[in-house]
């Protein structure tokens, strides 16, 4: 075996070999050290280089990968196996070598050329010492910094890392992103800079051509992180899908300007197509503009701007339809702006602005959940402070809030009061076992069609905390004072009114523990009784306006609430004792909670009650209904939760809910939930009052693999009182065996009104490390199917626990 080391301008030929048959060659090489030529013949030092094919591999979309190794890469380059050489030296090892020092060397048979981080294997190689250039064939493999190039012939400058190769297969991986290609020619223009001609490339594993981009030429510059393709076609399953004369794409996952993959869906409004263009304006600023069309409605334009700085960040969105053919309306739009600014460590400000062109916008373009959740659209500006003051902690805020209230299908609007402005503060200071504090709030309420005015709330209190490891007692004394200055409205005169109420409560509890065995192991079980006494005197409040108060629903948490109303305009009367007990089961080794259950009831010592209209009425009762809950997470496989409100006088449940979820592994989810309410709010009527009725709903959902690669996603939400489905969803998702691509198709039907439905069909296609086509399924599925994970995001092993 012959070897050659070079560091221009010196060429030194040496011979080394291992094995008994190499002794003669080594002796000859030693004798001819000063001779300008050296030669020898030994056995192979590397495996034969595989021939190059100008095909990326199989275009079969549904073929299985029996190897089970999606990232398998063929080992095609081997080094000499000898000690490292100094920087900028070149080492050549071959079966035979001849040539002239300082001029040119010819190496044949299992050639290995090594220089710095570059290794070349070839059948033969000519090394030009003066130009530091190597020419290699009939087959070669070149490895450098995570890039492997194989082909038939190569001309390559080792120092400048430039050259040209023919009939080339290239594989590269940087930063976890893989790229493979086959090309008629490949020009190497410097480190990490290539130009490929008549090429096909994708981001799949070796041998997988389920999809690829075919282009007349591609220039890729890893330093700039950009690739540019000319006359390119996207090919999926061997079928050309899309052509573009020019396209650029990121090589490193970083953002860059350019066309994004179109979005396509179909539904009650026909086929919708959107073609977004992304603008990478600065490292901290980008924008997206997406013109499109909605089949039965016409042209639509979407825009988004995002910005980010160390001290502020925000996003604005705009959707505009110049003319909606289906409704006949012009200039329909939706606008949003969210902004947050950290002025200092203690001072923050922000904006939350939302507006649509008309009340029917959400009904026409969104589902039932978005319709119900967007009746009053916020327009809010706020300023918050959190810091220290007078030896204690102070949290304060200033905000201005107005709403755009959307009318229901009957044309009725229930518009809340605007806050113009609201100033609030809360100060707390700990002194030993006691904490003193005061909460204050000033609000100017504004309304177009109701009496408005200003309200000042001042609530000083003192709390004590007597706690130890087995229990606690926490008394509290407070004085709630409210002052109103009301404006004249119609026949209502301007006036000033006030209300002052003392509030006394005592919260106490104990914790008992024992070690036992459950769920196949050691656990810690607790028993935690709790008593909460609350006293507020009865006082008529029907002369006070109701700007923002509403009733809270009765549940386990309400047993320990001071005021059963939200807001400050109504304060309930109270002389009651809440008694409850809960038990928890904790894993003895990790402390993880495995089970929790509780039950409680409230005992009344007087029958007075403050109604929502402010009047004081009588409710003959000595105790409340029972409320209870239970939840369990047995490992991460089973999740159970339930709650009930039981009317002991009528011996019936007022409402209850029970749910169960089984999640044995990623991509395996079964959910079931039933909800019942005897007298629930159903919808807002045209006269402004709510329609109450019985509510009985069953919600079933699942994600489950049908085969190794194919999964089903379903949801069925049925209303028993309405005697019809509220939402039905079914979909199928496929992930290729090597993870190179994934796809899904979904159909959905959901209620948008009392007698109206919407249908939708949408699909998604995910290409590994490149892009996605269509809607992101996670945008809808994680709400419809709790625990859902998109198929393309699942790990290679489906049996992994979540």
From Swiss-Prot:
GO cellular component: cell outer membrane; transporter complex
Signal peptide: 1-29
Record has Signal as a keyword: yes
Membrane-crossing segments per the record: none
Cited Gene3D superfamilies: Lipopolysaccharide (LPS) transport protein A like domain
Family annotation (Pfam families): LptD
Source superkingdom: Bacteria
Places the protein is found: Cell outer membrane
Key words, A-Z: Cell outer membrane, Membrane, Signal
GO BP: Gram-negative-bacterium-type cell outer membrane assembly; lipopolysaccharide transport
Function statement: Together with LptE, is involved in the assembly of lipopolysaccharide (LPS) at the surface of the outer membrane.
HAMAP family xref list: LPS_assembly_LptD
Quaternary structure annotation from Swiss-Prot or TrEMBL: Component of the lipopolysaccharide transport and assembly complex. Interacts with LptE and LptA.
Family to which this protein belongs: Belongs to the LptD family.
Protein name according to UniProt: LPS-assembly protein LptD
Gene transcribed to yield this protein: lptD
């Amino acid at each position: 075996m012959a070897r050659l080391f070079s560091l221009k301008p010196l060429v030194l030929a040496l011979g080394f070999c291992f094995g008994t048959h190499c002794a003669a060659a080594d002796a000859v090489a030693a004798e001819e050290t000063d001779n300008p030529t050296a030669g020898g013949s030994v056995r192979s030092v590397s495996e034969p280089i595989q021939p190059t094919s100008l095909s990326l591999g199989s275009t079969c979309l549904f073929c299985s990968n029996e190897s089970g190794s999606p990232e398998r890469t063929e080992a095609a380059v081997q080094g000499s196996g000898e000690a490292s050489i100094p920087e900028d030296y070149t080492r050549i090892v071959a079966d035979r070598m001849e040539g002239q020092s300082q001029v040119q060397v010819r190496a044949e048979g299992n050639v290995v050329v090594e220089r710095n981080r570059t290794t070349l294997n070839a059948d033969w190689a000519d090394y030009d010492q003066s130009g530091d250039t190597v020419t290699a064939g009939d087959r070669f493999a070149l490895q450098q910094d995570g890039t492997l190039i194989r082909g038939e012939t190569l001309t390559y400058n080792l120092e400048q890392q430039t050259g040209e190769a023919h009939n080339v297969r290239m594989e590269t991986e940087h930063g976890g992103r893989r790229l493979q290609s086959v090309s008629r020619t490949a020009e190497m223009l410097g480190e990490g800079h290539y130009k490929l001609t008549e090429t096909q490339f994708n981001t799949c594993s070796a041998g997988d051509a389920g999809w690829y981009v075919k282009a007349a030429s591609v220039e890729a510059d890893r330093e700039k992180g950009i690739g540019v393709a000319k006359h390119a076609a996207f090919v999926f399953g061997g079928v050309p899908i899309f052509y573009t004369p020019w396209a650029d794409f990121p090589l490193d996952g970083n953002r860059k300007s350019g066309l994004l993959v179109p979005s396509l869906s179909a539904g009650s409004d026909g086929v919708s197509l959107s073609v977004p263009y992304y603008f990478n304006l600065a490292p901290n600023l980008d924008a997206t503009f997406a013109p499109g069309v909605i089949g039965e409605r016409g042209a639509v334009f979407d825009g988004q701007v995002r910005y980010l700085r160390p001290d502020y960040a925000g996003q604005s969105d705009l959707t505009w339809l110049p003319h909606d053919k289906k409704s006949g309306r012009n200039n329909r739009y939706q606008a949003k702006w969210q902004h947050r600014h950290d002025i200092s460590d203690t001072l923050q400000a922000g904006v939350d602005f939302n507006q649509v062109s008309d009340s029917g916008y959400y009904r026409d373009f969104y589902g039932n959940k978005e319709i119900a959740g967007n009746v009053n659209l916020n327009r809010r500006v706020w300023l918050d402070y959190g810091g220290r003051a007078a030896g204690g902690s102070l949290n304060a805020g200033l905000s201005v809030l107005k709403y755009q209230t959307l009318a229901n299908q009957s044309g009725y609007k229930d518009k809340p009061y605007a806050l113009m402005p609201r100033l609030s503060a809360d100060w707390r200071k700990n002194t030993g076992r006691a904490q003193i504090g005061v909460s204050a709030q000033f609000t100017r309420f504004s309304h177009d069609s109701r009496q408005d005015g200003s309200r000042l709330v001042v609530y000083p209190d003192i709390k004590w905390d007597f706690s130890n490891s087995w229990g606690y007692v926490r008394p509290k004394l407070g004085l709630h004072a409210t002052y109103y200055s009301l404006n004249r409205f119609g026949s209502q005169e301007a006036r000033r009114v006030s209300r002052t109420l003392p509030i006394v409560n005592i919260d106490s509890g104990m914790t008992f523990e024992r070690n036992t065995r459950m769920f196949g192991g050691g656990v810690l079980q607790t028993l935690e009784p709790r008593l909460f006494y609350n006293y507020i005197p009865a006082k008529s409040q029907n002369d006070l306006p109701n700007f923002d108060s509403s009733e809270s629903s009765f549940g386990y948490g309400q047993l320990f609430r001071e005021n059963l109303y939200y807001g400050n305009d109504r304060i309930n009367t109270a002389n009651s004792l809440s008694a409850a007990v809960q038990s928890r089961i904790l894993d003895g080794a990790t402390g993880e909670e495995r089970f929790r259950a509780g039950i409680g009831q409230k005992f009344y010592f007087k029958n007075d009650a403050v109604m929502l209209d402010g009047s004081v009425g009588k409710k003959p009762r000595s105790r409340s209904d029972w409320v209870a809950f239970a939840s369990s997470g047995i490992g991460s496989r089973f999740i159970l939760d339930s709650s009930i409100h039981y009317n002991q006088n009528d011996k019936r449940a007022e409402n209850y809910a029970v749910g169960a979820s089984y999640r044995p592994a990623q991509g395996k989810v079964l959910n079931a939930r039933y909800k019942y309410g005897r007298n629930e709010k159903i919808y807002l009527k045209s006269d402004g009052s709510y329609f109450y009725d019985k509510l009985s709903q069953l919600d079933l959902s699942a994600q489950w693999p049908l085969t190794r690669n194919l999964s089903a996603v379903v949801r069925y939400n049925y209303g028993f009182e309405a005697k019809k489905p509220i939402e039905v969803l079914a979909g199928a998702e496929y992930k290729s065996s090597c993870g190179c691509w994934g796809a899904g198709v979904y159909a959905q039907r959901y209620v948008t009104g009392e007698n109206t439905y919407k249908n939708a069909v949408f699909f998604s296609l995910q290409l590994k490390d490149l892009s996605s086509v269509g809607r992101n399924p996670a945008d809808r599925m994680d709400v419809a199917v709790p625990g859902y994970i998109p198929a393309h995001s699942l790990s290679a092993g489906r049996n992994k626990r979540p």
